[in-house]
UniProtKB/Swiss-Prot annotation:
Record's protein name: Ribonuclease PH
Pfam family membership, one: RNase_PH_C
CDD domains hit by this protein: RNase_PH_bact (cd11362)
Species assigned in the record: Burkholderia vietnamiensis (strain G4 / LMG 22486) (Burkholderia cepacia (strain R1808))
GO MF term list: 3'-5'-RNA exonuclease activity; tRNA binding; tRNA nucleotidyltransferase activity
Keywords on record: Nucleotidyltransferase, RNA-binding, rRNA processing, Transferase, tRNA processing, tRNA-binding
Subunit: Homohexameric ring arranged as a trimer of dimers.
Amino acid sequence: MTSSLSRPSGRRADELRKVALTRHYTKHAEGSVLVEFGDTKVICTASVVERVPEFLRERGQGWLTAEYGMLPRATHTRSDREAARGKQTGRTQEIQRLIGRALRAVFDLEALGPRTINIDCDVIQADGGTRTASITGAFVAAHDAVSKLIAAGKLARSPITDHVAAISVGVYEGAPVLDLDYAEDSRCDTDMNVVMTGAGGFVEVQGTAEGVPFSRAEMNALLDLAQAGIGRLVQLQKDVLGADHV
């Protein structure tokens, strides 16, 4: 890390934004969380449906899927609702599939039984890192939904096998940095999103050079940064769940 690096936010290269996870944010969903990464704010809900998609009928297992969207004025300028346009963008489809894959990586779907957990991630304010914030918050929402199933006697044990969280990293002004906000993300040389389990396994790595190719050494440095950051996020998840951890 270079000591001369000046991030727009004034953070150190390895410093997360202020992260907050507020549980039980809405009253109807089985699990709900407001996740905040600095000025990025996402409402994550987990809803339980006592059925599975057609392709899983008679398989004796459950399913977890995700949807993602942004409010029209979540960004600097208003965007039309995708429902009004009649179709989702490729970006939206990519992100919601990523969220679903990330959470399924830490779920025993057979132990979940023949039911579906629907994750909804709605971005109410975007300042970079909405997909990584969504994954980190959605895990806690899904955990609370599972806790309610156990309390209701619908599950004998938790189907959750580990924690999962995600963070962005990038090369900004020639230096690897953790948790990019919009000001950095829009000007970085490399942008990477990393999803990992609490045990340190990689679920997904999405990395792109924005004009300037990155070296193997830079990639290793970015992954090291991401692993350390995700470790702190997993600890925050555990702290927030506290005695309710299943």
